[in-house]
């Protein structure tokens, strides 16, 4: 009889657990705040976006030098991430006084920087910001993609440490 009572208690507990909704906490994977509110937060957000972009560009450079067949998909994914982060960096750095032109040097022909300039890899236009570039490091002209990205991005680029903005369109 005690065994039967124990089974009923366990069954009722399990039933009550199943009936309750299960909730999960979202844990952000990026250290970049989504909507910085203060000047300090904007500066930190801008700096973090540029640092994370640098790490992705390093990974992209390593993948582009790897000739294995599996690296192609990874390069494609990394290029999309780099372009998305360039957009984030351009948006979060706007008005902070940060100079984003060193990102051109950081990419060194592997990717490009600048809102409104299309990125290209293996002859296919890519969405996002960036100067047109192929994985071999040869810049490509992407004027038609540039116009599309300027409208899509709608952001400005930061001028030299003055805090003034110049339009990317």
Swiss-Prot record:
Keywords for the protein's UniProt record, in alphabetical order: Repeat, Signal
- Report whether Repeat shows up as a keyword of the record: yes
Origin: domain of life:
Eukaryota
| Originating species | Antheraea polyphemus
Region Disordered: what ranges? 119-169
Task performed by this protein: This protein is one of two components of the prominent 'filler' that helps mold the shape of aeropyle crowns.
Q: Which residues form the signal peptide?
A: 1-19
**Protein name per its UniProtKB record:** Chorion protein E1
Q: In residue terms, where are the Tetradecapeptide repeats? A: 114-127, 128-141
